[in-house]
Amino acid sequence: MAELHIIGQIIGATGFPQNSLFCKWGVHTGGAWRLLSGLREGQTQVDMPQTGDMAYWSHPIDLHYTTKGLQGWPKLHLQVWHQDSFGRCQLYGYGYIHVPSSPGQHRLQCVTWRPLGSWQDQLSEMFVGGGPQLRSPDLIYSGADRYRLHTVGMGTVELELCIILRHFDRYGVES
């Protein structure tokens, strides 16, 4: 079968309202893809930079897939969270990015967004914290009902991925 290796890292995030950020990530694929090695999801550590607004995670990603076709090419979905001084966590943004289909090293930026909520939600968020979250994280990468959401743009997550394709031509999979 054709093989895909994804090796890289989630470098960090910038442009968020506050520091002390961490990132939950996962990979979504179609039914023809099988994970041979690596973790399908994970979480970075919390980084609270002393200077600047860039939170650095340098979180490794190392995945090895086999596939019979290109349908359902892997997508990386991200959730950026803020942890306050009391240890409470608040969602700061959702985002997703398609894994590049060309071999080589790629530096990527994933823009993030979060649901806006009503003015009552926004007022409550200002005083109590929290805020609206998606009921189903599948909405992050499937565009079915995402167009109906009222959202606000948040920061950007930087990634560096190296893509290795193996035996795609041998098995008739054209990339």
UniProtKB/Swiss-Prot annotation:
The keyword Cytoplasm appears for this protein? yes
The C2 B9-type domain sits at 2-118
Does the UniProt entry include the keyword Cell membrane?
no
Q: Cite the PROSITE patterns for this sequence.
A: C2_B9 (PS51381)
Q: Which UniProt keywords apply?
A: Cell projection, Cilium, Cilium biogenesis/degradation, Cytoplasm, Cytoskeleton
BP-aspect Gene Ontology terms: cilium assembly; establishment of planar polarity; establishment or maintenance of cell polarity; opsin transport
- The UniProt entry lists the main location of this chain as cytoplasm
Location within or outside the cell:
Cytoplasm, Cytoskeleton, Cilium basal body; Cytoplasm, Cytoskeleton, Cilium axoneme
What GO CC annotations are associated with the protein?
A: centrosome; ciliary basal body; cilium; cytoplasm; MKS complex
Q: Which one of the record's GO molecular function terms can you name?
A: gamma-tubulin binding
Functional description taken from the UniProt entry = Component of the tectonic-like complex, a complex localized at the transition zone of primary cilia and acting as a barrier that prevents diffusion of transmembrane proteins between the cilia and plasma membranes.
Record family assignment:
Belongs to the B9D family.
Assembly and interaction partners: Part of the tectonic-like complex (also named B9 complex).
Q: What is this protein called?
A: B9 domain-containing protein 2
Q: Which organism is it from?
A: Danio rerio (Zebrafish)
The UniProt gene name for this protein comes to: b9d2
